[in-house]
C-alpha cells in the first residue's frame, strides 16, 4: 500500500515539474513571437550543409555577411550557405546588413551536423515503435496459442509392459534378491576346506 502512495506522489511531482517547464517554454515563445516574422533569420540544416537566410527587412539588394565581426568573402545573397559546417570552427555570431540600411541583424549560430543523419519526425518514430510492439505481442500470442493447442492434442505416453519393463505400481516394493548359487553362505556344521576361516598362529 505504501508503494502505491509513493507512485502517486512521484506522478504528481512529475506533473508539476512538467507544468512548470511548460510555463517557462511559453514565456520564451512569447518573447520570440514578439519579433515580427520579417525580422527573423531562417536556418536550414541538411547533412553537413547549413544555410542561413537573412531577414526580409533588408530586401534583396547587395547583402553583406559578417561572422564574429569579420566580413565573409563571397557572400552577397540573402542566403549564406556553408557546405562543410563545423561546430567548432563555424559556430559564432553572424550578422547580415544591406548597403542602404546600416542596421545589422545578429544571430548566434551553433549547429550540430553529421554526414549520415536522417531527419525523422516524431510521428514516424511513434508509428515505428507502436508497430513493433504490436507485432511482438502478436507473435507472442500466436506462439502461446499454438503451444496450448499442441499440448491439448497430444496423447499421454504410456510405457508398454514388455519383458524388460514393469508397471509403475510395482516399483514401490522390490522383492528380495535371489541368492547366487556361486556364492553359497558358510555353513557352521560342515568341516570342509573352505567352510570356515582358518586362523594360523604366528
UniProtKB/Swiss-Prot annotation:
The modification Phosphotyrosine is found at residues 183, 194. Residues 144-202 are cytoplasmic. Phosphorylated on Tyr residues after T-cell receptor triggering by LCK in association with CD4/CD8. The keyword Iron does not apply. Coiled coil: none annotated. Pfam families: Ig_5, ITAM. InterPro entries: CD3_esu/gsu/dsu, Ig-like_dom, Ig-like_fold, Ig_sub2, Phos_immunorcpt_sig_ITAM. Gene3D superfamilies: Immunoglobulins (2.60.40.10). Disulfide bonds join 54-96. CDD domains: IgC1_CD3_epsilon. Residues 156-202 are annotated as: Disordered. Residues 170-187 are annotated as: NUMB-binding region. Residues 174-181 are annotated as: Proline-rich sequence. Residues 22-122 are extracellular. GO terms for biological process: adaptive immune response; cell surface receptor signaling pathway; positive thymic T cell selection. The TCR-CD3 complex is composed of a CD3D/CD3E and a CD3G/CD3E heterodimers that preferentially associate with TCRalpha and TCRbeta, respectively, to form TCRalpha/CD3E/CD3G and TCRbeta/CD3G/CD3E trimers. In turn, the hexamer interacts with CD3Z homodimer to form the TCR-CD3 complex. Alternatively, TCRalpha and TCRbeta can be replaced by TCRgamma and TCRdelta. Interacts with CD6. Interacts (via Proline-rich sequence) with NCK1; the interaction is ligand dependent but independent of tyrosine kinase activation. Part of the TCR-CD3 complex present on T-lymphocyte cell surface that plays an essential role in adaptive immune response. When antigen presenting cells (APCs) activate T-cell receptor (TCR), TCR-mediated signals are transmitted across the cell membrane by the CD3 chains CD3D, CD3E, CD3G and CD3Z. All CD3 chains contain immunoreceptor tyrosine-based activation motifs (ITAMs) in their cytoplasmic domain. Upon TCR engagement, these motifs become phosphorylated by Src family protein tyrosine kinases LCK and FYN, resulting in the activation of downstream signaling pathways. This is T-cell surface glycoprotein CD3 epsilon chain. The lineage of its organism: Eukaryota, Metazoa, Chordata, Craniata, Vertebrata. The gene is CD3E.
Amino acid at each position: 500500500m505504501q508503494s502505491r502512495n509513493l507512485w502517486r506522489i512521484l506522478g504528481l511531482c512529475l506533473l508539476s515539474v512538467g507544468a512548470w517547464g511548460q510555463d517557462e517554454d511559453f514565456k520564451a515563445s512569447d518573447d520570440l513571437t514578439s519579433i515580427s516574422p520579417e525580422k527573423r533569420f531562417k536556418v536550414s540544416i541538411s547533412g553537413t550543409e547549413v544555410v542561413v537566410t537573412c531577414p526580409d527587412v533588408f530586401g534583396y539588394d547587395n547583402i553583406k555577411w559578417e561572422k564574429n565581426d569579420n566580413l565573409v568573402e563571397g557572400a552577397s545573397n540573402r542566403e549564406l550557405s556553408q557546405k562543410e559546417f563545423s561546430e567548432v570552427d563555424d559556430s559564432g555570431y553572424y550578422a547580415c546588413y544591406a548597403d542602404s540600411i546600416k542596421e545589422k541583424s545578429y544571430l548566434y549560430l551553433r549547429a550540430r551536423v553529421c554526414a549520415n543523419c536522417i531527419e525523422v519526425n516524431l510521428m514516424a518514430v511513434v508509428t515505428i515503435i507502436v508497430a513493433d510492439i504490436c507485432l511482438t505481442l502478436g507473435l507472442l500470442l500466436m506462439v502461446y496459442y499454438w503451444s496450448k493447442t499442441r499440448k491439448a492434442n497430444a496423447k499421454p505416453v504410456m510405457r508398454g509392459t514388455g519383458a524388460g519393463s514393469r508397471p509403475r505400481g510395482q516399483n514401490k516394493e522390490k522383492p528380495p534378491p535371489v541368492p547366487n548359487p556361486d556364492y553359497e553362505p558358510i555353513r557352521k556344521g560342515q568341516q570342509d576346506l573352505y567352510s570356515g576361516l582358518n586362523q594360523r598362529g604366528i
